[in-house]
Amino acid sequence: MLFAGDGDYYFSLDDDILYPRDYVERMTDFLQRGNNAFIAGVHGARLKTDIKHYLTDRDVANRRMAIATESSVHILGTCTTAFNTDTLRLDVRRWKHRNMVDLTFALICTERGIPLKIISREENWVGSQEENQSDSIFSELQKDDTVQTTMAKALQQFHTNNPEREQQ
Protein backbone atom coordinates (compact mmCIF):
# COMPACT_ATOMS: atom_id res chain seq x y z
CA MET A 1 0.00 0.00 0.00
CA LEU A 2 2.90 2.35 0.63
CA PHE A 3 3.69 2.37 -3.08
CA ALA A 4 0.15 2.69 -4.43
CA GLY A 5 -0.43 5.67 -6.66
CA ASP A 6 -2.99 8.40 -6.18
CA GLY A 7 -6.46 7.26 -7.16
CA ASP A 8 -5.51 3.58 -7.30
CA TYR A 9 -7.79 0.91 -5.94
CA TYR A 10 -6.40 -1.25 -3.16
CA PHE A 11 -7.74 -4.76 -2.60
CA SER A 12 -6.93 -6.69 0.55
CA LEU A 13 -6.94 -10.41 -0.19
CA ASP A 14 -6.43 -13.67 1.69
CA ASP A 15 -4.94 -16.85 0.24
CA ASP A 16 -7.58 -18.97 2.02
CA ILE A 17 -10.48 -17.27 0.24
CA LEU A 18 -11.97 -18.03 -3.17
CA TYR A 19 -12.85 -14.79 -4.94
CA PRO A 20 -15.30 -14.78 -7.86
CA ARG A 21 -14.22 -13.72 -11.34
CA ASP A 22 -16.23 -10.49 -11.10
CA TYR A 23 -14.90 -9.54 -7.64
CA VAL A 24 -12.68 -6.62 -8.68
CA GLU A 25 -15.24 -5.27 -11.16
CA ARG A 26 -18.16 -5.36 -8.70
CA MET A 27 -16.21 -3.96 -5.77
CA THR A 28 -14.80 -1.15 -7.91
CA ASP A 29 -18.27 -0.36 -9.28
CA PHE A 30 -19.67 -0.31 -5.71
CA LEU A 31 -16.99 2.18 -4.67
CA GLN A 32 -17.44 4.37 -7.74
CA ARG A 33 -21.22 4.56 -7.23
CA GLY A 34 -20.41 6.04 -3.81
CA ASN A 35 -17.76 8.43 -5.18
CA ASN A 36 -15.05 6.35 -3.47
CA ALA A 37 -16.09 7.91 -0.14
CA PHE A 38 -16.13 4.68 1.88
CA ILE A 39 -14.36 1.36 2.35
CA ALA A 40 -16.10 -1.56 0.65
CA GLY A 41 -16.20 -5.06 2.05
CA VAL A 42 -17.95 -8.39 1.85
CA HIS A 43 -17.66 -9.66 5.43
CA GLY A 44 -18.77 -7.19 8.12
CA ALA A 45 -20.27 -6.77 11.56
CA ARG A 46 -22.26 -4.32 13.61
CA LEU A 47 -21.49 -4.14 17.31
CA LYS A 48 -24.27 -4.53 19.83
CA THR A 49 -24.84 -1.68 22.28
CA ASP A 50 -23.56 -3.45 25.39
CA ILE A 51 -20.36 -5.34 24.61
CA LYS A 52 -19.19 -7.95 27.08
CA HIS A 53 -17.40 -10.23 24.61
CA TYR A 54 -16.30 -9.31 21.12
CA LEU A 55 -17.15 -12.72 19.70
CA THR A 56 -20.74 -12.82 20.94
CA ASP A 57 -21.78 -9.16 21.02
CA ARG A 58 -21.86 -8.39 17.32
CA ASP A 59 -24.14 -9.15 14.41
CA VAL A 60 -22.06 -10.63 11.62
CA ALA A 61 -22.80 -10.52 7.90
CA ASN A 62 -20.60 -13.46 6.93
CA ARG A 63 -18.93 -13.35 3.52
CA ARG A 64 -20.87 -16.46 2.46
CA MET A 65 -24.29 -14.95 3.26
CA ALA A 66 -26.60 -13.43 0.69
CA ILE A 67 -27.05 -9.71 1.37
CA ALA A 68 -29.90 -7.98 -0.47
CA THR A 69 -29.01 -4.40 0.43
CA GLU A 70 -25.71 -2.60 0.79
CA SER A 71 -25.35 -1.43 4.37
CA SER A 72 -23.04 0.27 6.85
CA VAL A 73 -21.14 -1.79 9.39
CA HIS A 74 -18.80 -1.04 12.30
CA ILE A 75 -16.16 -3.61 11.28
CA LEU A 76 -15.10 -5.12 7.97
CA GLY A 77 -13.26 -8.39 7.53
CA THR A 78 -10.10 -7.04 5.94
CA CYS A 79 -9.69 -10.19 3.85
CA THR A 80 -12.45 -8.81 1.60
CA THR A 81 -11.94 -5.04 1.52
CA ALA A 82 -11.36 -2.55 -1.25
CA PHE A 83 -10.90 1.20 -1.31
CA ASN A 84 -9.50 4.06 -3.31
CA THR A 85 -6.13 5.32 -2.11
CA ASP A 86 -7.42 8.90 -2.29
CA THR A 87 -9.82 7.91 0.52
CA LEU A 88 -7.38 6.07 2.77
CA ARG A 89 -3.63 5.61 3.19
CA LEU A 90 -2.20 3.30 5.84
CA ASP A 91 1.14 2.17 7.15
CA VAL A 92 0.46 -1.11 8.94
CA ARG A 93 3.99 -1.16 10.32
CA ARG A 94 2.79 1.39 12.87
CA TRP A 95 -0.08 -0.74 14.16
CA LYS A 96 0.15 -1.73 17.80
CA HIS A 97 -1.56 -5.13 17.72
CA ARG A 98 -0.71 -8.19 15.68
CA ASN A 99 -3.54 -10.39 14.35
CA MET A 100 -6.18 -7.76 15.15
CA VAL A 101 -6.26 -6.15 11.75
CA ASP A 102 -10.06 -5.93 11.41
CA LEU A 103 -10.53 -3.97 14.63
CA THR A 104 -7.45 -1.80 14.12
CA PHE A 105 -8.63 -1.01 10.58
CA ALA A 106 -12.15 -0.21 11.84
CA LEU A 107 -10.84 2.10 14.56
CA ILE A 108 -8.62 4.00 12.11
CA CYS A 109 -11.40 4.41 9.55
CA THR A 110 -13.90 5.46 12.22
CA GLU A 111 -11.51 8.01 13.72
CA ARG A 112 -10.95 9.45 10.22
CA GLY A 113 -14.68 9.54 9.48
CA ILE A 114 -14.54 6.98 6.67
CA PRO A 115 -17.67 4.80 6.49
CA LEU A 116 -17.43 1.02 6.16
CA LYS A 117 -20.00 -0.69 3.92
CA ILE A 118 -20.77 -4.20 2.77
CA ILE A 119 -21.74 -4.94 -0.79
CA SER A 120 -24.99 -6.66 -1.74
CA ARG A 121 -24.41 -10.13 -3.15
CA GLU A 122 -25.78 -13.59 -3.65
CA GLU A 123 -25.07 -16.47 -1.27
CA ASN A 124 -21.53 -17.88 -1.53
CA TRP A 125 -20.37 -15.12 -3.88
CA VAL A 126 -17.10 -15.29 -1.94
CA GLY A 127 -16.07 -18.72 -0.69
CA SER A 128 -13.34 -20.38 1.34
CA GLN A 129 -10.66 -22.93 0.58
CA GLU A 130 -11.19 -24.44 4.03
CA GLU A 131 -13.38 -23.63 7.02
CA ASN A 132 -12.53 -23.76 10.74
CA GLN A 133 -8.78 -24.11 10.40
CA SER A 134 -7.18 -25.01 13.72
CA ASP A 135 -4.30 -22.57 13.16
CA SER A 136 -6.48 -19.58 12.22
CA ILE A 137 -6.62 -16.22 13.96
CA PHE A 138 -10.32 -16.91 14.62
CA SER A 139 -9.42 -20.13 16.49
CA GLU A 140 -7.12 -18.13 18.75
CA LEU A 141 -9.83 -15.52 19.25
CA GLN A 142 -12.22 -18.21 20.48
CA LYS A 143 -9.79 -18.99 23.30
CA ASP A 144 -9.38 -15.38 24.48
CA ASP A 145 -11.04 -12.25 23.08
CA THR A 146 -10.03 -9.89 25.90
CA VAL A 147 -7.97 -7.45 23.82
CA GLN A 148 -10.50 -7.53 20.97
CA THR A 149 -13.32 -6.83 23.44
CA THR A 150 -11.47 -3.77 24.74
CA MET A 151 -10.92 -2.53 21.19
CA ALA A 152 -14.58 -3.18 20.26
CA LYS A 153 -15.74 -1.22 23.31
CA ALA A 154 -13.58 1.72 22.20
CA LEU A 155 -15.05 1.50 18.70
CA GLN A 156 -18.60 1.31 20.05
CA GLN A 157 -17.93 4.27 22.36
CA PHE A 158 -16.76 6.33 19.39
CA HIS A 159 -19.99 5.53 17.52
CA THR A 160 -22.06 6.34 20.62
CA ASN A 161 -20.33 9.71 21.02
CA ASN A 162 -20.63 10.50 17.29
CA PRO A 163 -24.13 9.37 16.27
CA GLU A 164 -23.96 11.32 13.00
CA ARG A 165 -21.40 8.76 11.79
CA GLU A 166 -24.03 6.02 12.05
CA GLN A 167 -26.02 7.61 9.22
CA GLN A 168 -23.20 7.46 6.66
Residue spans of the language-model regions?
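Short, high-confidence coil segments that cap the C-terminus of an alpha-helix
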Residues: 7, 35-37, 114
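Conserved catalytic-core segments centered on acid/base and nucleophilic motifs
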Residues: 10-14, 18-19, 105, 109
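Cofactor-binding active-site loop characterized by glycine-rich and histidine/acidic residues
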Residues: 4-6, 13, 142, 149
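C-terminal catalytic/acceptor-binding lobe
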Residues: 90-168
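Conserved catalytic core of nucleotide-sugar-dependent glycosyltransferases
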Residues: 2, 11, 18-93
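A conserved donor-nucleotide-binding helix/loop in the catalytic core
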Residues: 1-10, 104
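Conserved beta-strand termini and adjacent loop/short-helix elements that scaffold enzyme active sites
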Residues: 4, 42, 119-121
